[in-house]
Regions:
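Short beta-strand-to-loop acidic/aromatic patch adjacent to the donor-nucleotide binding site
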Residues: 111-123
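Active-site donor/metal-binding and catalytic loop motifs
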Residues: 17-24, 235-255
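Conserved donor NDP-sugar-binding/catalytic core segment of glycosyltransferases
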Residues: 127-173
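Terminal low-complexity segments of carbohydrate-biosynthetic enzymes
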Residues: 1-3, 8, 263-399
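N-proximal low-complexity "stem/linker" segments adjacent to membrane-targeting elements
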Residues: 1-50
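Acidic donor-binding segment of Leloir-type glycosyltransferases
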Residues: 51-88
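A recurrent flexible, glycine/aromatic-enriched loop bordering the glycosyltransferase active site
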Residues: 177-203, 252
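Donor nucleotide-sugar recognition loop
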Residues: 198-203, 212-229, 234-239, 256
């Protein structure tokens, strides 16, 4: 991609009200389906339905160009289908099962050519949806995919991810991580396209005909990652003005999520044809367990070990555990001290003061590590004083 821009030089007093670019190229008249998966978030998804209906589906300019498909994995939603809105009750098979059901239903609508996967809180501008649809209508390659960058909801000018990069078929890292979108230089950085491996389902738009495989309808964290892995032919791009605001993932660290996260990493590694992928997975596993253990997150470490064993149990495990009923019971049985749910805290409007112990000194850190957090020395040598650690300090060296 290159830059198209306007230079304006005024010879006298004048006002520039706006400008636009036009093309004589043929543009398809097909529609786009907005697919949302929700689970027991009635208030959020109802607000999203009403907002999209008011600003998009009932507007004369757009009403024939968009359809809304809401896949409900939880309790009934008080909203009827009709007028471009389809509400579908679905078995709770996670985000993957919900979005794949929405994709199947979108294929049944004759004039729908493109689909956007979106979060149920619809935390994006309507302009992002319109801009994405216009871009895909002009795309020459059916494998062109648009992913919206993710901005932090508590710091909305900072980018968490603008697409993600694959590393050795199973590790991945976010592109443009912590880029401040307010700077002029940031625009150049943002437009510096790289080979993106997958895009998050908080905003992921594509041509229906480019989808070769459905994702497995089972619970994983990062089901969008597996979907991207199965569609490596996709040419994933990002666009200025196409973004979504989301909660910081580090606030979602929990025992269950850590179990699911490791499964997400393990599956691509186990099916990869790359040499030593399984060995690298084992090294990654040992590293993550040690990091969690030295961070005093022992229940989280146990969940990772459980996940590792389950992933090596064969296909029967996946077939017998499509839902999370039995796995939740096992996770709950080992979770006693790490149940704190920071997702429910209003971090934008509320704050809590805690005594700060300061950053751990290097000598203390050294002794803590060589004594395995003090477990190798008698308990009476230890000062039993609780300390407060920032929720982001998953890594023990950040204490």
């Amino acid at each position: 991609f290159g830059y198209i821009y306007v230079e304006w030089q005024s010879d006298e007093d004048s006002v520039l009200n706006g400008f636009e670019f036009l093309t004589k190229d043929h543009v398809s008249k097909s529609s786009m389906a907005l697919v949302i998966t929700t689970y027991n978030r009635k208030e959020a998804v109802t607000k999203t339905i009403n907002r999209i209906n008011k600003t998009l589906l009932t507007q004369s300019e757009f009403k024939d160009r968009f359809k809304l498909i809401v896949v409900n994995n939880g309790e009934a939603i008080n909203h009827q289908s009709g007028n471009g809105i389809m509400v579908i009750n679905n078995e709770n098979l996670g985000g993957s099962g919900g979005f794949m059901r929405g994709l199947i239903e979108a294929r049944k609508i004759n004039d729908v050519k493109h689909v956007i996967f979106m979060d149920d809180d619809g935390s994006c501008e309507i302009e992002s949806i319109c801009r994405t649809h216009a871009f895909l209508l002009m795309a020459k390659d059916k494998n062109t995919v648009v992913t919206g960058c993710m901005l932090f909801e508590d710091n909305p000018a900072i980018i968490h991810e603008s697409g993600a990069i694959w590393h050795r078929d199973f590790l991945h890292y976010p592109d443009k991580h912590y880029l401040d979108a307010r700077g002029i230089d940031s625009l150049d950085t943002f437009d510096n396209e790289r080979k993106i491996g997958y895009g998050g389902w908080w905003f992921f738009a594509f041509n229906i005909n480019a989808i070769e495989y459905y994702s497995f309808p089972f619970f994983v964290r990062g089901d969008d990652l597996l979907f991207g892995y199965m569609h490596k032919k996709h040419n994933i791009v990002t666009l200025n003005g196409v973004a979504s605001w989301q909660m910081d993932f580090e606030r979602k660290i929990s025992v269950l999520n850590s179990y699911l996260n490791f499964r997400t990493v393990a599956v691509p590694a186990l099916i990869s044809k790359r040499k030593f992928a399984a060995l690298l997975l084992s090294v990654f596993f040992v590293r993550e367990v040690f990091l969690a253990s030295f961070s005093c997150r022992y229940e989280l470490a146990r969940a990772m070990i459980m996940s590792y064993n389950d992933c090596l149990s064969g296909r029967e495990f996946w077939e017998d555990n499509v839902d999370l009923l039995e796995i939740r019971k096992r996770i709950n049985a080992i979770t006693h001290n790490e149940k704190f749910n920071v997702e429910g805290i209003d971090i934008i409007n509320g704050c809590v003061d805690y005594p700060c112990s300061g950053k751990e000194k290097a000598i203390y850190k050294f002794f803590r590590c060589i004594t395995l957090n003090g477990h190798l020395i008698p308990a009476f040598f230890l000062i039993k004083k609780p300390i407060v650690v920032d929720y982001r300090h998953y890594h023990p060296t950040k204490f």
